[in-house]
Amino acid sequence: MTMITNLKRSFTLENIRELAKYLKGFIPNIQDDETLLSFLDAMYTHDPDDNFDILYHGFMFRGISSNLLLQVENIDEMSYASWSKDIDVAIDFASKQYAWHQYLLIRYGWAIDLAKVKTIALNQFDAPTGLENYNPSREKEVIAPLIHSECVILDISGNNRKPVEDFEQSMRI
């Protein structure tokens, strides 16, 4: 059983409502419950034709190819500058193609403080491509800190970083 399965099962209606309240404050287009529910539903929907799976690769924009990041191998050896550039490219692409998405909820493979989180595996949970020498022991070392304390809301401009303190506790597994 993957941590993703555990995380998904750990979400109660109360947890979702807390997350929803927080997201409403940061995503301008979410003005009603119906839109919000659609947004939340998308976060747990895998569409192979769209090459889009928020849950497996962090909360990502619809239409961004997961391969944009998964094609990177040996992430441990990548420099901060190179890794940052790849993230910026993805964010820039998203902002142009899907401007209504104002913010990204960063989890799992997307890390903001790369000085603190040195090693990130984007495919640690059943992803079809990516790191060939992924060590499951890194799940606890790298992913757990992201789940428990490194969740952030990232302004699409990349200039505004806000800790997700309002619902951090409810997201713990």
Which residues make up each language-model segment?
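Short hydrophobic beta-strand segments
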Residues: 54-67
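Conserved NAD+-utilizing ADP-ribose enzyme module
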Residues: 1-55, 73-81, 85-173
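Short aromatic-glycine-(Arg/Gly/Cys) micro-motifs in beta-strand/loop hairpins
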Residues: 69-71
